[in-house]
Amino acid sequence: MANKREYPLAKTRNIGIMAHIDAGKTTATERILYYTGKIHKIGETHDGASQMDWMDEEKERGITITSAATTAVWKDNRINIIDTPGHVDFTVEVERALRVLDGAVTVLDAQAGVEPQTETVWRQADQFNVPRIVFANKMDKIGANFDYSVQTIKDRLNVTPLPIQMPIGAEDDFIGLVDLVKMVAYVYDEDKLGTNWDTVEIPDDMKEEAQKRHDEMVETLADIDDNLMEKYLEGEEISVDEIKAAIRKGTLEEQIFPVLAGSAYKDKGIQMMLDAVIDYLPSPIDVKPFVAHDADGNEIELTAGDDKPFAALAFKIATDPFVGRLTFLRVYTGSLQSGSYVLNATKDKRERIGRLLQMHSNQQQEIPEVFSGDIAAAIGLKNTTTGDSLTDPDHPLQLESMDFPEPVIQVSVEPKSKADQDKMDKGLQKLAEEDPTFKAETNPETGETLIAGMGELHLDIIVERLRREFHAEVTVGKPQVSYREAFTKTASAQGKFVRQSGGKGQYGDVWIEFTPLKEGEGFEFEDAIVGGVVPREFIPAVEQGLKEAMQNGVLAGYPLVDMHAKLYDGSYHEVDSSEAAFKVAASLALKNAAKKADPVILEPIMKVDIVVPQDNMGDVMGQVTARRGTIDGMEERGNAQLIHSFVPLSEMFGYATALRSATQGRGTFTMTFDHYSAVPKSVQEDIIKKNGGNN
C-alpha cells in the first residue's frame, strides 16, 4: 500500500542558503537546524564542529564546499535546505543547487553589505528565477549597519529591497528587532541561546522611525499590488494579513526582496527568518512550471503533484563512506517507492532504486517513498550522473539538463608507490563522477596523470580527498593553465595516406575544408560527399580521425576547438581502403590545413574583482596591468574601491600573496572564468618552445 505524504505540498519549502564566503551562512544554517529540533548542540564553524560542513576538508578550512542537503520542520512545514558554498571555485555547486531550489535566503554580513561573491550568486539565482529573502547577519559585529546593507542591495544588485524589520541597537547593543509588519518589538533574553524573547511594544525612542518605515514599506507594496493601492489611497486600515499577502506576491514575482536582520552567532533573528521562509518563499506549487520533453521531443510543462507519472532530476552524486554512492534527487512530479525501477531517460537505461534516504547533513534516515517536491538521496543507481533525468519507465521525459563549464586549470599528480597508483585511480574516478567540473586523464605519451578543475582551491581539495578518503599518497606538480588551440582562417587541405609494403596495403584520401567557429560552439562535422567518392562506411572514421587529431592540437599539443569541418572530396581503393587508413588521412588533412589557417593558442581569461583601500589603488591597478590585465571599471565601496578587471589565468598564480603585501592584508579578490582569448604572439612562441612544438 502506498504511503501518505507527511507534509502537503503547500507546506513544503525547498530553499538554498547563499552568501559571500564568511558572511556567516553555515552558522545561520546551524541555528536553523538547532531551532527546528534537528541538532541538540550548536556547532560553530570556527571551531570545526559545524553540522552542515561534513567533509573533513570543510571542517579544517571552515568553508562550505559541497551542498549538503538537510531537512527540517518549522511550524508544521517541511523545509529542505541546501547549503551552498560561497567560494568562487565552487560556483558550479551553487548553480547545481539553485537548479533544484524553489527559493533562497541570501545571507549578508551587515558590516560589508553586498560583496562581490554575493553579486555572483545573486546573478546565478536570477538566471534560475529564484525568489529570495535577505538576512543581514552579524548585526552584533563592530561596524554592523542594517541601513547600509539595505542600500547596497539597491545599489549593487539593482533590485528593490523591502526591509520588514529594523534592528534594536547594533554591535554589542544589538538586543532585538522591530517587526514592521506587525508593528511590535522582540527583545531577546541573553541567557537562553535565542530560544526566549519577549514580544513588547516598540520602544518609545523608535516609534516614530518605525512608523515611518512601516509606511514606506506599505507604499512600496501598494506600487505592486492593486488591492493594497486602493486601500492605501482611500486611507483605509490595512491588516497584517493583507500586508503579508502582498509581500508574498511581490517576492514570488521577484519584484521585491524582503530584508531581515539578526545575528546567527548570537542566536537572534533566526526564528523570524524561518517564519519569513514559510510566509514569503514559494512552495513547489507556487513556482513556474518546469519544462520537459517527451519521447517525441514535444515540450511539456510539469507542475507539482503526486498523482502524475514520476519525474526527477539527479542533481548531485556523492560518495558516503558507509553506504557508498548516493544520488541526490529533486522530485518534480509523482512519487517513487524504494525498490522500484526508474528509467534514466538521459542514458535510456533502466535502473533500480535500492533504498531512499532523507539527508540530514551527512546522517541519513531511511524512508519508504518520496513524493513530488521532495529532495532525497537514492542508493543503487549505478549509471546515473549529475544532470540526468529519472522518470517512470512508461512515461519517459527528458528534463532540461545542466550545463557545466570546462575546467581551466590543471596539475599533474603522481602516486608515491605502486600501491598508491590503484588507490589514486579509483579515487579520481569516484571524484570525477561526483563533480562534473573536475576531470582526470592520463597523457598517452608521457603516462602522466593530469587533473583539471575550476581553480587552485578546487584542486587542493581534490588532492586532500585523495589522501584522506582513498588513502592515496600523491605528489602534485605545479598548476598549469588549460590552453586551447583554434584556427583563425578558413583553409582546405588534402590528407592522403598510402602504404604499400607487402601484404594488404593502406589507402585513404580526403579533401576537407576547415572553418573557425565562435567560442563554445565546439566541433561540427559535415558530410558533403557526392557520388560516393568516399564510401559511406568510411565517413564516421574520417570524423573520428579528426576528433582524435584535434585532441593533440597543431601548435603545442593543446586541444583544437570550435571548428566546422566539411568533407567534400576524396578517393578510395577497392581493396586497400580501411577505416584506419581514412582516420590517418583525416589527421593529415588537419595538419596540412593548419599551415594555411593561422592557428593560435587560446588562454582562459578570468574576471577578477578586487576590493582595495583607496590608498592602495595605484599599486593594485599597476599589478593588474603588469599581469597583462585590463581594467573594466571601478566602483566606490564605502572607503574602499572595487576594481573590475580581466586577467589571463596564467598571470594569476601567486596573486593572493602579491595583493596581500600590496594592501597589508586588507585587499580581497574574487576570480571566475569569463572567456577564452588568443595569447599575444610572444607568449605563443614561449608556450610552443616550452612544449617542444607539435609539428
UniProtKB/Swiss-Prot annotation:
GO terms for biological process: ribosome disassembly. The keyword Protein biosynthesis applies. Gene3D superfamilies: 3.30.230.10, 3.30.70.240, Elongation Factor G (Translational Gtpase), domain 3, P-loop containing nucleotide triphosphate hydrolases, Translation factors. It comes from the Bacteria. GTP binds at residues 19-26, 83-87, 137-140. Keywords: Cytoplasm, Elongation factor, GTP-binding, Nucleotide-binding, Protein biosynthesis. It is found in: Cytoplasm. InterPro entries: EF-G-like_DII, EFG_II, EFG_III, EFG_III/V, EFG_IV, EFG_V, EFG_V-like, G_TR_CS. GO terms for molecular function: GTP binding; GTPase activity; translation elongation factor activity. One of its GO terms (cellular component) is cytoplasm. SUPFAM superfamilies: EF-G C-terminal domain-like, P-loop containing nucleoside triphosphate hydrolases, Ribosomal protein S5 domain 2-like, Translation proteins. Belongs to the TRAFAC class translation factor GTPase superfamily. Classic translation factor GTPase family. EF-G/EF-2 subfamily. NCBIfam families: EF-G, PRK12740.1-3, PRK12740.1-5, PRK13351.1-1, small_GTP. PANTHER family: RIBOSOME-RELEASING FACTOR 2, MITOCHONDRIAL, TRANSLATION ELONGATION FACTOR G-RELATED. Catalyzes the GTP-dependent ribosomal translocation step during translation elongation. During this step, the ribosome changes from the pre-translocational (PRE) to the post-translocational (POST) state as the newly formed A-site-bound peptidyl-tRNA and P-site-bound deacylated tRNA move to the P and E sites, respectively. Catalyzes the coordinated movement of the two tRNA molecules, the mRNA and conformational changes in the ribosome. This is Elongation factor G. It comes from Limosilactobacillus reuteri (strain DSM 20016) (Lactobacillus reuteri). The gene is fusA.
